[in-house]
Amino acid sequence: MVKKLGLNFKNTKTSVSELKQRIVFLIVAIIVFRIGSFIPIPGIDTTILSKILNNQNGTIVDMFNMFSGGALSRASIFALGIMPYISASIIIQLLTLVYPTLSEIKKEGESGRHRINQYTRYATLILALVQSIGIAMTLPNIAGIRSIIINTDFYFYLIAIISLVTSTMFLMWLGELITEYGIGNGISIIIFIGIIAGLPSAIGNTIEKTRQGDLHILLFLFILLLIFSVIFLVVFMERGQRKIVVHYAQRQQGRRIYETPSTHLPLKINMAGVIPAIFASSIVLFPATIISWCKVNHEWLTKILFYLQPNQFLYLILYISAIVFFCFFYTGLVFNPRETADNLKKSGAFISGIRPGEQTAKYINKIMLRLTLVGSLYITFICLIPEFMRSAMNVPFYFGGTSLLIVVVVIIDFITQIQTLIMSNQYESMLKKANLN
């Protein structure tokens, strides 16, 4: 009895200790990331650059600056953030559909996953190099102001490119360490921290505006109610699933026939996650950003720039269309109904009233199309709420729809990871107790 109590106490202590270690590691990693976001690239007058980039509201620069926790506006070594890694991951996923060799590697299990990760790292290095060269070459010519660069010689470009590339690779490595030794997905955590870095000052500014009477108290309360409602909707939709009941063939042992219990195939409503919102924002904002950087006095370019500004009708149409397109595109990329149907058939599973194989694939695909349509409408709604708040009601809204989605999804994943860690430790404890008996 005493031995059992001692083992139970030891297992509980080990579980709490492991959770503490992971949380401490996560906090240290976050501190390292935030410190790095304040280290400037050598040779840049960050004060002038910050003033210039503050005028880039509603452009792709503004979005990347938020994802990097303000590192871009400070010309920090972390200015590229983790975006090259995200782009590289999506490119590699696309290539697995085009090249059969990569598709076969992906199916090799743990070894295949390791090789795909290596290819993703190489692609990240290439993208980071290209983007860092672009930033280094663009910085001296932003808005035609050359005074932000103290000395525009060869060594400035070399140091800037090396600083940006190595910092991006460091962030990728830090994200992988967080995934392994911390809690949650490391890359998502880094993006999450970057987004919420400016949240305290935004809350303070909103409260100050309310206190001074610039923002009506009822409007302030409405904003709070809206935020909580949106968070509730995001949690509900992200946790929502369509469960398809799956049966297994009867198992015969000797003369007896055993009925195998049925299970279900869970299909998420929003299978694409936040990727469609990120890609849609990037693509729609990119042309306007490039035009605003180029000092070209063509009337037709000025008109294009005007119509591609946030809250303009053309911008909203393109934005909504891009979100819906990428929802269907990315869902088709990460989920293959035919492959799922083949796996069910191989394991002896079937859906009641549906023939295994081709008919099952068509049935699953039909359900996925409906779920993706609902998911795309949900993401579009979330992404348009901040636009409506800013334009129609002239309300300061710190989060964009993309950022709000990322924040809530990462928090959900973080809580799930903690619950999983606690449950796995409790399960191990139960197994040890059973072996002791």
Curated annotation (Swiss-Prot):
Can you tell me where the transmembrane regions are?
Answer: 23-43, 77-97, 125-145, 154-174, 183-203, 217-237, 271-291, 315-335, 367-387, 395-415
**Per the record, what is one GO cellular component?**
plasma membrane
Tell me where it mainly resides: membrane
What is the name of the protein in this document?
Protein translocase subunit SecY
Organism this protein belongs to: Buchnera aphidicola subsp. Acyrthosiphon pisum (strain APS)
Enumerate the Gene Ontology biological process terms.
Answer: intracellular protein transmembrane transport; protein targeting; protein transport by the Sec complex
> Record's family?
Belongs to the SecY/SEC61-alpha family.
Sum up the protein's function in the record's words.
The central subunit of the protein translocation channel SecYEG. Consists of two halves formed by TMs 1-5 and 6-10. These two domains form a lateral gate at the front which open onto the bilayer between TMs 2 and 7, and are clamped together by SecE at the back. The channel is closed by both a pore ring composed of hydrophobic SecY resides and a short helix (helix 2A) on the extracellular side of the membrane which forms a plug. The plug probably moves laterally to allow the channel to open. The ring and the pore may move independently.
- Gene assigned in the entry: secY
Xref: PANTHER family: SECY/SEC61-ALPHA FAMILY MEMBER
Give the record's keywords alphabetically. Answer: Cell membrane, Membrane, Protein transport, Translocation, Transmembrane, Transmembrane helix, Transport
